[in-house]
């Protein structure tokens, strides 16, 4: 039987979603697979909609796995949460999946949110869940810059990590919204798929624009140059959240 689950996790202590050979530390995938084994004594592979990097959080990661069991869905969910209780991972929902469902390849849209605290004083309580940017940001300029990245089939070669293995750097970004709420700024980014570290490079570029390092229209030149060195810094991972996956 194939199961589909929505998962929340704090990425702080993890090396990322995916198991990585030769890398010290624990992955989210490993934690969930270990919990399933403790429940069923079955070795399964858990697949995710988004292979989040080390330090990146999830409010609505979607996963699937195949399991041979007669247990009811709620029993599986509660048991996994019991085994995951010390790992900062929580199964929010779990149900039988339709035949052929794949958490990654069936996804139609992924929604990310990046959280910035924009004030002089550094945060204490959530310092590993947001990016502290002390210098005042112009959110209007950030939004104008973001508008140049929204639309069908743009080449984001300047906005992907050097280690990105995707064959094509062309992506359609459906939404980038920059919203200020008091001292907090939220950057919402939605697309069917993203390049490696694309969202974080977008956010880093928008922050530099918000500081006045370059005008919003300069984003057009960054896209045209198709060179990672042309774009801004890569925002740190701990402000990024995978919020929702649509199917």
UniProtKB/Swiss-Prot annotation:
Catalytic site positions: 53 (nucleophile)
A GO MF label: RNA binding
BP terms from Gene Ontology: tRNA pseudouridine synthesis
Pfam families, sorted: PseudoU_synth_1
CDD domains in the record: PseudoU_synth_EcTruA (cd02570)
InterPro entries: PsdUridine_synth_cat_dom_sf, PsdUridine_synth_TruA, PsdUridine_synth_TruA_a/b_dom, PsdUridine_synth_TruA_C, TruA/RsuA/RluB/E/F_N
Entry binding sites for substrate: 112
Entry's EC annotation: 5.4.99.12
Keyword annotations of the record: Isomerase, tRNA processing
Keyword tRNA processing: yes
Top-rank taxon: Bacteria
Transmembrane regions: none
Assembly behavior: Homodimer.
UniProt xrefs under HAMAP family: TruA
Record family assignment: Belongs to the tRNA pseudouridine synthase TruA family.
Free-text function comment from the UniProt entry: Formation of pseudouridine at positions 38, 39 and 40 in the anticodon stem and loop of transfer RNAs.
Name of this chain's protein: tRNA pseudouridine synthase A
Organism the protein comes from: Anaplasma marginale (strain Florida)
């Amino acid at each position: 039987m194939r199961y589909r689950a929505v998962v929340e996790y704090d990425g702080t202590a993890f090396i990322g979603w995916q198991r990585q050979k030769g890398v010290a530390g624990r992955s989210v995938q490993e934690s969930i697979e270990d919990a399933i084994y403790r429940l069923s004594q079955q070795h399964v592979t858990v697949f995710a909609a988004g292979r989040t990097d080390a330090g990146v959080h999830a409010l609505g990661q979607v996963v699937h796995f195949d399991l041979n069991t007669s247990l009811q869905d709620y029993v599986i969910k509660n048991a996994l949460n019991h085994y995951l209780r010390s790992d900062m991972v929580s199964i929010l929902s779990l149900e039988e999946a339709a035949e052929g469902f794949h958490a990654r390849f069936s996804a139609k849209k992924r929604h990310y949110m990046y959280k910035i605290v924009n004030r002089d004083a550094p945060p204490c309580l959530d310092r590993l869940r947001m990016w502290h940017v002390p210098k005042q940001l112009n959110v209007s300029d950030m939004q104008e810059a973001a508008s140049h990245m929204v639309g069908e089939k743009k080449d984001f070669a300047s906005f992907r990590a050097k280690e990105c293995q995707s064959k094509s750097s062309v992506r359609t970004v459906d939404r980038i919204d920059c919203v200020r709420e008091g001292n907090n700024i939220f950057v919402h980014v939605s697309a069917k798929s993203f390049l490696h570290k694309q969202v974080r490079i977008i956010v880093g570029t928008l922050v530099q624009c918000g500081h006045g390092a370059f005008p919003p229209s300069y984003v057009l030149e960054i896209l045209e140059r198709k060179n990672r060195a042309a774009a801004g810094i890569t925002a740190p991972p701990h402000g990024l959240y995978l919020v929702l996956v649509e199917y």
